[in-house]
A protein has these predicted regions:
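Beta-strand secondary-structure signal
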Residues: 70-74, 148, 172-174, 217-221
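Mixed-charge, glycine-accented linear interaction segment located at domain edges/termini
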Residues: 126-143, 189-240
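Extracellular interaction modules
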Residues: 66-70, 140-148
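Solvent-exposed edge beta-strands and adjacent loop segments
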Residues: 2-85, 196-217
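Short, solvent-exposed loop/turn segments that connect beta-strands within catalytic domains
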Residues: 24-27, 183-187
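Hydrophobic membrane-targeting and insertion signals
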Residues: 2, 149-154
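Extended beta-strand solenoid/passenger and fiber regions
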Residues: 80-142, 152-186
Length: 240
């Protein structure tokens, strides 16, 4: 039984784990673990209807309905898996080739492409365009003229496909943090449990040269599972 005089403060972000949802609604295998979050926010809202009457027309009875619980996660870092969950169906495929374009001037097209760290990779085949977008041959290149060279490179990486029919999925979500006791000044365990959370489709990636590094936001909308319990807030102690 909770002591009504016990009070706690929270000043720490949560580590959040996403799980698959099994066919019976139970928690499945973990699919994503986030331990680099900057902000993790839980917000509950609802609508109201009320009966008013009497002198001054004050509210007499208030009905609450339309409960909404949303969770906002702001991550300092991203992984291939987190990006796949944010923008697609949670899957990522192996990538073997990419297309690159570089500019050059002169009568000879480059045969190498410079990557990070000053390393170079060979260009085995390319297409050259002039500033009007027309294809030109290597023997027609002119000095002091700018051209665009497009080519494919063999790479190792991952690809996330975002199609018109692909949207983020629904997951069982838990978040673990600490609550500090006013009495003892010690941290105790605190967890939120969401049996059914839909990842929202609205996402933004900011790429800019100045300012703070980009953050990666994931917004969740809490849904009602079969037993009606949309979320649990648990403060617990593992004991000595």
């Amino acid at each position: 039984m909770a002591n009504i005089l016990d009070r706690y403060g929270i000043k720490e972000v949560a580590d959040v784990t996403f799980y698959d949802v099994n066919d019976d609604g139970s928690r499945g295998a973990p699919v994503l673990y986030l331990d680099t979050l900057k902000v993790s926010t839980i917000e509950q809202t609802a609508e109201e209807a009320e009966a008013r009457g009497g002198k001054g027309n004050p509210p007499l009875i208030i009905w609450d309905y339309g409960k909404e619980i949303t969770v906002t996660l702001e991550d300092a870092l991203f992984s291939v898996k987190s990006m796949a969950i944010m923008f697609g169906d949670g899957t990522a495929d192996d990538l073997t080739t990419i297309t690159k374009t570089q500019t050059f001037k002169g009568t000879t097209a480059p045969t190498q492409y410079t990557i990070l760290g000053g390393k170079t990779v060979s260009i085995t085949s390319s297409t050259i365009y002039d500033v009007t977008g027309s294809v030109v041959t290597s023997d027609s290149l002119q000095a002091d003229t700018t051209y665009f060279q497009t080519f494919d490179l063999t790479v190792t990486g991952s690809s996330i496909e975002i199609s018109a029919q692909t949207f983020p999925g629904t997951y069982y979500v838990t978040g673990d943090t600490y609550a500090r006791s006013e009495t003892t000044g010690k941290d105790e365990f605190f967890q939120f449990i969401i049996p059914k959370a839909k990842v929202q489709s609205e996402n933004t990636i900011t790429l800019e040269a100045e300012g703070d590094p980009s953050v990666f936001n994931m917004n969740l909308r809490v849904m009602r599972p079969a037993d009606g319990v949309m979320m649990k807030l648990v403060k617990y102690d593992l004991g000595e």
